[in-house]
């Protein structure tokens, strides 16, 4: 069974780390081991809320270090799931090309791409950095628009329309502010965290021991 990789993308300050803290809290199940790889160094830290070593945070300097260390990190921690956090200074295709190399595809698969954006600056980024930012939006399964409390309705509508024009298939999660990410995710019921996942993790871990 391949390790699931989730990519959390977005520009510095968009709220990626807060989002990761929320998905860790809302989606981890008993027996699941998660490796979080941070390819950026923002102010906010991943919160290790439990004490049973169910997830590990490892900071990487750049994409070259990811290529160099990913396999050894997988062997060291034997995760069920990997979350990669990186900002918009790395082209989307760059990290995609790395993770699609044969050595990684044999043991891993990208299952979900999240794009996290600040609703206040999203339109400006799309208008000014369109060719750079569009691939992130195009390939996202879920797009998180943060800080909607601080957006005029007109601006929020423009943001949603621009996203829909670029990626009509993605699930758009509108978050009022950084304090409500977790509750908004919980209410949306879009994360894999139920009985079937618990059973799947238990079976996978059982066979890994043999």
Question: Where do the model's predicted regions map?
Answer:
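Short, hinge-like loop/turn segments at secondary-structure boundaries
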Residues: 52-54, 132-133, 189-192
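Short, charged/polar "capping" segments at the starts of alpha-helices
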Residues: 42-48, 122-123, 151-156, 180-182
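Short beta-strand/turn micro-motifs composed of small residues
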Residues: 9, 38-40, 117, 145-147, ...
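Phosphate/Mg2+-binding loops and adjacent switch elements
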Residues: 86-162, 166-167
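Short, surface-exposed, polar/charged, turn-prone segments marking secondary-structure boundaries
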Residues: 34-36, 62-67, 109-113, 137, ...
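Nucleotide-state-sensitive switch-loop elements of NTP-binding domains
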Residues: 2-9, 14, 18-112, 123
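Classical N-terminal secretory signal peptides
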Residues: 1, 142, 206-210
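C-terminal accessory "lid"/substrate-recognition subdomains
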Residues: 152-210
